[in-house]
Amino acid sequence: MTPRPSAWRCAALALALAGCGSRAAPAGPNKHVASARSDAPGSIDPVLLARVQTTGPIGHVATASILAAPVDADVWSDLAERFDQAINAWDLADAAEVVAAMPAGSARDVKAGVLAFHRATYPEAEALLAGAVASGQLPPAGALREEAQHYLELARGAQRALGPATRLTSPDGQVEVVFSNAKDELIAPYLFAAMAEARQALGADLGIEPDHPVRFEILDDAVKLALVSPLTRENVYTTGTVGITKYRRIVMVSPRVMLYGYGWIDTAVHEYVHYLVTLKTRNRAPVWLQEGLAKLLETRWRSPDPLPLEPPARKLLAKALAADDLVTFAEMYPSLAMLPSQERAALAYAQVQTMLGVLREERGGAGIDELLRRVAAGEDAEAALATAWGDTFERFDAHWRDVMKKRAAGKPGGALRKLQFLAPEQQAAAEAGEDLSLLGDVFSHLGGGAARQHARLGVLLTLRGHLGPAARQYEKARAADARVRDDPKLARRLGELYLQLGKPARAVPLLRRAGEDDPEQPNLAAAEGRALRLVGDLAGARVALARALRVNPFIPALHCDLAQVATDPTEQQREQGLCRE
């Protein structure tokens, strides 16, 4: 997700919530300790620091009273406006030129601090902003002081969130990733490979590529998102927010700290779409347009065309269309992360994804390009979409509703998979590869008959390590009621047991059935991948293992199977090093 264009104090929040033809994951990333470089978080530009210490603080109000030397108020106002426009558009080179042209003083220090924050030199930003606030030269109230306080809190929050971070740079130099916890460096080669695919595909789709490395920050606690953005802890947990794009960087939560992981690679590409749209439109795209394109194109790294809505989202959209209970564009502002539930957020995504999907299907890439060009020129986004489609927005909206109602008619739905944050007491078990999904009443949906009784006994026996008897109980459950014989949850548990019992041929059809129902469950996908490998279906195994990897790469045994099916010697060596049975 990404901010709406406007002055900083009115900015919308930058927020968010598998292959085909993918390149081999590049090896040998360049590793740096973030504090070991003069341009890294943890370092302070000595020239700017000296300026703060000797000339006093730098920034913006249309008055010369807080500047070190007299300056024409109109000149200052023009400089401040140009700076705000540049920083909002992430044009840091232009913003730096403006700061250099500003006279010394506390107002300039504020703008220099904002620039340093966007450069991710957080200690430098803190020094500049804290100096400006403490100088006594800023007005006691007003936009400039609010701006200084806002970015000072963010600069301090970013340092607390990242701590003694480490940094890896992709072999092509196009991506840099900063990790708050070194354990999460495991994801780097997979992220670099996906981003190489995304850069090529999305560059063609959107007609733009960054001329600088794209910065990712990977956090080891979802709560830390509230330290580095205007989000609150409640926003994060209510809507399951795991990624944001703001201040010219992408910030994500590690899948390691989620109960069952999450689609972290799709999320990374989703956020990268925001990044590109922000650059292309100079940050003038509203939330609904940003989110629609990001959701539509988030799978382009692994698919030649955008993928259709998943059944749960399709069901949500069909129900909302029938009840005329859609999320309005106004409700989406300033961020989908501020909607009241994961269901409403998922519905909003489904709406805007399919709206932009209809435009792309019917007008092609040229339609998307015209829409973005018009928005970049300052045109209202709804009017721009209407022009790109070829009629009024009202007629487009009616057409889109009709199309989606027809597509959803008679199609199966499914339960929405909600993101769950890992509790501290679950961390050790998850890192050891334990499947926490067996906890609780797993088979309550089977009702109160014999099938459920046998299935529950199967769970208890599994937890006690009696795998053979557990499998027999699951078979009895399937035999007890024809309606549950094909139950995907039951199929999964039985398939996993047969795999552990050394019967992969019996496991494959059961795990495949379960995977059709829940393709994003990483433990299930990993089990299916192993079963397919053991029966000799290496191509099928690679597909299943890739599903697991893009949701939770921290399943220890997953890498053992990836090593066995790897065709590239470098990949094989890397995966073997990560293998933990």
What are these regions (language model features)?
Residues 1-11:
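Bacterial N-terminal signal peptides that target proteins for export
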Residues 20-23:
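Bacterial signal peptide processing site
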Residues 28-30, 36-101, 127-131, 343-346, ...:
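Beta/coil-rich, acidic/histidine-enriched accessory regions frequently appended to metallopeptidases
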Residues 69-70, 102-108, 134-151, 283, ...:
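Short solvent-exposed coil/turn linkers within tandem alpha-helical repeat scaffolds
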Residues 72-76, 88, 92, 106, ...:
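Solvent-exposed, acidic/flexible segments
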Residues 88, 118, 130-138, 196, ...:
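Sec-exported extracytoplasmic/periplasmic mature domains
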Residues 146-169, 173-175, 557-581:
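Terminal, low-structured helical/coil segments at or just beyond the last alpha-helical repeat
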Residues 164-287, 297-306, 318, 323-326, ...:
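Juxtacatalytic substrate-recognition/specificity segment
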